[in-house]
């Protein structure tokens, strides 16, 4: 049992989650939340307060999950909570992929640079289309990493879930993410050929 706990603490998954949760907590501690557009404010209002799940922007399934959870967590805005947690999951996925490919030290530096550039905006200015783009990118990157390493285990399915949730938040970014996935996949196949 002790070995399993030590192995879990040394794993790339724990590394990715721990570093991104710490960064998320620091940013949340020093900033205040705001909506980047009025659309997300109204989506949040309709879904979490009025429980109106039919929306042109947000998928019905995601709106139903968010609104139903709002009945349980009365003191939190679940729309904002989901945006923050999904952003943290996406940043953690990108960190995991880089730790898997380049090692923990390079992944740590990359994660710091990535979070300095993007996480402040994701955690303080809530916008569902930004979160969707981040989720789709991270999800496709996780899936590509799993396909490349021929490991169709938990990271692959987490990548698929991130793509699904990213599509739920903003469907129009799915094809942009898919184009990047295809470009990464072709580039990776070419790089493998010359190894």
Model-identified regions with their sequence ranges:
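Start-transfer (signal-anchor) and selected internal transmembrane alpha helices
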Residues: 1-24
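Extracytoplasmic catalytic/substrate-binding loops of multi-pass membrane glycan-assembly enzymes
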Residues: 26-45, 53-66
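Short hydrophobic/aromatic helix or loop-helix immediately within or flanking a transmembrane segment
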Residues: 53-77, 81, 85
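Transmembrane-helix motifs of polytopic, lipid-linked glycan transferases
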Residues: 84-104, 142
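Aromatic- and kink-enriched transmembrane "portal" helix at the membrane-lumen/periplasm boundary
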Residues: 111-138, 142, 168
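Membrane-interface transmembrane helices that cradle and orient dolichyl/undecaprenyl
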Residues: 139-156, 190-193
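Membrane-interface alpha helices of multi-pass inner-membrane proteins
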Residues: 154-176, 181-182
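Perimembrane helix-loop-helix junctions
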Residues: 176-195
